[in-house]
Amino acid sequence: MKINQEINSSKLSKFIAKSMDGKKAENIIIINLKKIKNSVTDYFVLATGNSNIHIESIANGIEYDVFKKFNEKPWNKEGVNNSEWVVIDFINVVAHIFNPDTRETYNLEKLWGDGDLINNNNEKK
């Protein structure tokens, strides 16, 4: 699946961050990975949910909002059964929704620290 020509990855990453914010996700960060050689995607969008139900709600909200606006479904979705870390893969943009402990353990911000970190207000960190 390739993202619809009308959607660019930057626009989609910001839209996903907005969707997360609408579901009261916390600590929303976009990581621009375009400059990193051999990166797996253009952008990661990271967020934290405060319970399994909250994480599931954020994930479902992203799918619904992206489909409603862009008529696109994710290529893959993982982690829904345990809701500690849900990954929604739109190929060029990958959304990660964590519980607080899992986010701290895997610390993708540090792991992919060569990318540009952008907070939800589009400000580079």
Locations of regions flagged by a protein language model:
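Polybasic/polar functional segments that serve as interface/processing modules
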Residues: M1-V40, N50-V86, P100-D101, L111-K125
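Short hydrophobic/aromatic beta-strand micro-patches
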Residues: L46-T48
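Active-site beta-strand termini and strand-to-loop segments that position acidic
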Residues: I88-F90
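Catalytic metal-binding acidic patch
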Residues: D42-F44
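Switch/connector loops and helix/strand junctions flanking conserved nucleotide-binding motifs
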Residues: E104-N107
